[in-house]
Amino acid sequence: MSGYPAEGEIIQIHSYKHNGLIHRVWEESIVLKGTSTCIIGANDKTMVTEADGRTWVTREPAICFFHAKHWFNIIGMIREEGIYYYCNLSSPFVWDEEALKYIDYDLDIKVFPDMTYILLDEDEYERHRKEMNYPDVIDRILKNNVKKLISWIHERKGPFAPDFIDKWYEKFLSYRK
């Protein structure tokens, strides 16, 4: 069993909640880079299944960045008016041959094409923190990772670098021919 999926492989992405219940499943993403510490994937118009069984289809191409050491993942959505980012505060990913998996910890940061951003779902986070008994150590890790993400946004680091999404989107297009 490999510690990560191979480049070009089609995988599912599974998001869970802290209590172990499935939160959301993305049916098909193509792996553009796969290492034991970082997976970069892409999808476009992929089926997403919610925990309650409802489904929807993503509207635009997206580049997805997952890391084994950071408590967040970053989705760059390519739209006509520019790149929007959706950052999920989450556990580092694991790969188990069935899917790329992570725990979603409610807090999100939405980043606009001009690199302004908003922190979302703080109320949901506090509610779930109590309901699911998030340990204090997880609370500290997540709050530190919010600061790290904001720093990355300001520094245009990682997926926020000016050419990052374009570079990986070009690679994604090469698989679609």
UniProtKB/Swiss-Prot annotation:
**What EC number is given for this enzyme?**
3.6.1.15, 3.6.1.6
Q: Name one GO molecular function term.
A: nucleoside diphosphate phosphatase activity
Catalytic function, reaction form:
a ribonucleoside 5'-triphosphate + H2O = a ribonucleoside 5'-diphosphate + phosphate + H(+); a ribonucleoside 5'-diphosphate + H2O = a ribonucleoside 5'-phosphate + phosphate + H(+)
What does the record give as cofactor? Mg(2+)
Top EC category: hydrolase
Which positions in this protein are listed as binding Mg(2+) 1?
A: 88, 104, 108
Q: Which Pfam families match?
A: DUF402
Note the Gene3D superfamilies from the entry: FomD-like (2.40.380.10)
Locate the active site.
24 (proton donor)
Please provide the record's keywords in A-Z order.
Answer: Hydrolase, Magnesium, Metal-binding
Indicate the transmembrane segments per the record. none
Establish whether keyword Magnesium is in the entry. yes
- List the NCBIfam families: PRK13662.1
Q: Which family does it belong to?
A: Belongs to the Ntdp family.
Cited function: Has nucleoside phosphatase activity towards nucleoside triphosphates and nucleoside diphosphates.
Q: What is this protein called?
A: Nucleoside triphosphate/diphosphate phosphatase
